[in-house]
Amino acid sequence: MVEIIPQNHFEVNTYVLYDETGECALVDVCSQTSREERAILDFVNSKDLKVKYILLTHPHIDHLCGAEFACREFNLPLSMSQDGVEILRTASWQAEAMGFKRINVEAIKINSLLPEEEISFGDISLKAIECSGHCPGSLGYYNAKEGYVITGDALFNQSIGRTDLQGGDLDCSFITLNKTFSHYLIIQWYIPVMDRKQR
């Protein structure tokens, strides 16, 4: 199951992935205010969930501005691609440029994920898939059993993420579309997908 909680002034989605076992993962915790933080905590507590992972699709401030809060609250590292750490270190500059609160990146412990690496919690298994182009270190999280992938800003409804920001690469975005997402059929814009082989 997936709960979508829109957050911050960019209206970015925080995702809570969970099942009947009560274990869950948070993806792109992007809360800016105590009220937004409370929305996440209220949902987790209402379902009596145990957070096992805090995942990041890519290290742009609008997707990671709540990471410090989440890592502290649940005593977990931030799981992300090692290739995105350099951009993560620019979070204070990004925050100032984009109107976000500053976060203390040094307080966040990183758990590096590799493309094709699988993580499991409860009865859910996710595969990290490379989503290069929009931002260095972009990962998608693919749930083959339920037929979706959370893509961050790599893919939108009839569009792709910007490539004019630091580290963006339009050619890489096209490679991601052709090589990675060609395996999937888009069925929802916010969490796109279903494996073509399952049709």
Q: Could you describe each region identified by the protein language model?
A:
Residues 32-37, 41-121:
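Active-site HxH/HxHxD metal-binding segment of metal-dependent hydrolases
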Residues 1-3, 122-125:
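Conserved N-terminal entry element of GNAT/NAT acetyltransferase domains
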Residues 3, 13, 109, 115-117, ...:
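Residue-level marker for the onset of beta-strands and adjacent loop->beta junctions
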Residues 1-47, 140-152:
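Conserved beta-strand hairpin/beta-sheet module of binuclear metal-dependent hydrolase folds
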Residues 31-32, 94, 124-199:
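Metallo-beta-lactamase
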Residues 5-7, 108-111, 130-132:
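Short Gly/Pro-enriched turn/cap motifs at secondary-structure boundaries
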Residues 25-27, 55, 78, 150, ...:
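Residue-level marker for buried hydrophobic side chains located in beta-strands
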